[in-house]
Each structure stands twice: as structure tokens, then as C-alpha cells.
């Protein structure tokens, strides 16, 4: 894959070939982190974007239902996630006031006027491309801390990935962006920006604190927590991912074992690094070992898959 940046952060222009393990070298403060952040943002903003758009619409839909149930003093009941999402995905951008009103009144104890439903339908029928552009811009803006553009340039910023002879491009302005997509992004990216995020696995009520993390750190820890929770709830979950990982990522696992010689032990909800019969709380292992512990957890829980992007 060829990854190209123009007028982004500290970078005027960059053309990088990503093939297997790619090492980017350079002096301090010349834009190496900008490349990593751009790659992370590009993949995660565009990966499975149709589902993300449907989730945005689903959230608006649920808020509408709850506000009308509350306003009519009807006891609130749990929303049927599968039902609302199925309805939204089946309609795409072709919602009608009549169909939405019918669905609401048949599935929930509410009565709504056509005028109220019309305002909801306006949101639901927003073009996919407009929603995607807004989502991608916000994601880049968040990761880049509000400084996407090269401050020494007045031109448009752009990020392009050329994959399988096709290209996906994001054109970025100060307050908006435009996505031109030829090839779907089918893999996630993970950025181990700070090895000390490993400590969050052993914090009480960690989910509550995740919002305080930057997107890169939150992305890694959230994925590990979710995958492990799925395994804890159902020991038969993630079997396919685990089998594929063991088969196709075996070489990586062998290399990892040279640095991460021990094993991970989970006891009473806490993670430990176990070596020579001694268990060390993840929070007490060295910074270097923490990075390898994160990779080990991502592999063993099926988070990190073949062709996913791992940025260190």
C-alpha cells in the first residue's frame, strides 16, 4: 500500500510504501508521529463506516423515542436494539414520515404527530456522504488535537491510500473534509502510543475512565476489554479469530515470546505477568514490557488480526 500525505501537520509532502514491517526514521520533531496519527485516523475513521453511520441514526432514533415516551408520562421500557437498527438499515436514505410513524406506533407505546416525525425523518434521510465527511473530519481533528493542516501552507491537506490499484483520498480543510473512496477499508488500525495505558486494565470501573483517554489509547484498551469480556461471558466466543491468529500470526507470536517470555494470568479481574512462578501486577512491570503485554493481549483475545495495522 502507498500512503501519501500532503500539507498535514508538520509534513509538506510524504509518500510512504507500507509493506509488512515498515520503519520510519528521522530527526525529532520532523513529523514521524504525524504519519502514525494520520494512518491511524485514516483506517479507523473509514473502517466499517456504514455501520457507524447507522449507529448515529439509531442513536437519534432512540432519543426521539425516549423523549416522546417521557413527555407522555408512559413508563419507559428497554429499547429493542436489534429492532431499531434493523429498521434503520432496511430503509437506508429512503425514510418516509408514514413508514416511521407506523413503525413507532406499532412497536412503542407512543402517539406522535406527523410534524414531529417529519423532523426525525429529516435527520434519518441525511446523505451518507455528508455524514461520513463530518465523522471523518471530527475524527482527524480529535486525533490531531485541532491542528490538521500544515500551518505553513495555505493549500488543501490530503491523505491518500493506494490499495490494490485503487485509491481512497480524504481532502481536509480547516473546518470540513471530503472523502473520495474507491476501495473499502476492511481492517482496523491500532496505535500503541503510550505503553502505560496497560495499567488501565487493572483499574476499578475502567470503562468510566476511558473517555479521558485520547482516541489512540482508548482504541487499544477498549478493544482488549471488550474482547476479554466476550470471552469471559462465553468461553466459546472469538474461536474463529483465535484459530486464524494462531495459524497466520504464529511467526509474530514466536518473535514476541523472545521479549515477553512469561505468561499473562488473569485473577479476580486483575492482569498479571507471570514468570518463573512469580506474578507481577501489570502496573508494576517495566515500560518496555508493557508494550509487549499490550500486543500479547491483542493477539490472544483475537483483537489484532492479519492485515490489521499496528503502529508503534
Where in the sequence are the language-model features?
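A broad, structure-centric signal for solvent-exposed, well-ordered loop/edge residues
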Residues: 12, 25, 31, 199, ...
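Hydrophobic positions in the central parallel beta-sheet of the AAA+
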Residues: 3, 310-312
Amino acid at each position: 500500500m502507498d500512503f501519501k500525505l500532503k500539507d498535514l501537520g508538520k509534513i509538506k509532502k510524504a509518500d510512504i510504501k507500507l509493506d509488512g514491517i515498515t520503519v520510519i526514521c528521522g530527526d525529532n520533531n520532523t513529523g514521524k508521529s504525524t504519519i502514525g496519527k494520520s494512518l491511524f485516523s485514516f483506517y479507523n475513521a473509514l473502517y466499517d463506516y456504514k455501520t457507524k453511520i447507522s449507529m448515529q441514526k439509531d442513536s437519534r432514533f432512540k432519543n426521539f423515542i425516549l423523549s416522546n415516551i417521557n413527555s407522555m408520562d408512559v413508563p419507559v421500557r428497554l429499547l429493542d436494539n436489534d429492532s431499531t437498527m434493523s429498521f434503520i438499515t432496511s430503509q437506508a436514505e429512503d425514510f418516509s414520515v408514514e413508514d416511521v410513524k407506523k413503525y413507532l406506533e406499532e412497536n412503542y407505546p407512543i402517539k406522535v404527530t406527523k410534524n414531529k416525525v417529519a423532523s426525525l425523518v429529516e435527520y434519518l434521510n441525511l446523505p451518507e456522504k455528508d455524514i461520513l465527511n463530518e465523522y471523518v473530519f471530527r475524527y482527524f481533528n480529535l486525533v490531531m488535537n485541532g491542528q490538521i493542516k500544515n500551518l505553513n501552507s495555505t493549500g488543501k491537506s490530503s491523505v491518500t491510500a493506494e490499495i490494490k490499484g485503487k485509491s481512497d483520498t480524504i481532502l481536509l480543510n480547516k473546518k470540513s473534509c471530503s472523502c473520495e473512496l474507491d476501495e473499502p477499508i476492511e481492517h482496523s488500525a491500532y496505535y500503541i502510543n503510550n505503553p502505560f495505558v496497560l495499567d488501565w486494565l487493572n483499574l476499578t470501573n475502567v470503562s468510566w475512565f476511558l473517555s479521558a483517554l485520547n482516541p489512540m489509547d482508548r482504541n487499544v484498551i477498549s478493544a482488549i476489554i471488550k474482547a476479554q469480556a466476550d470471552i469471559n461471558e462465553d468461553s466459546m466466543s472469538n474461536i474463529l479469530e483465535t484459530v486464524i491468529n494462531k495459524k497466520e500470526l504464529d511467526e509474530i507470536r514466536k518473535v514476541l515470546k523472545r521479549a515477553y517470555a512469561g505468561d499473562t494470568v488473569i485473577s479476580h479481574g486483575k492482569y498479571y505477568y507471570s514468570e518463573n512462578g512469580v506474578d507481577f501486577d501489570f502496573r508494576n512491570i517495566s515500560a518496555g514490557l508493557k508494550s509487549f503485554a499490550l500486543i500479547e493481549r491483542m493477539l490472544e483475545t483475537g483483537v489484532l488480526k492479519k492485515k490489521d495495522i499496528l503502529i508503534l
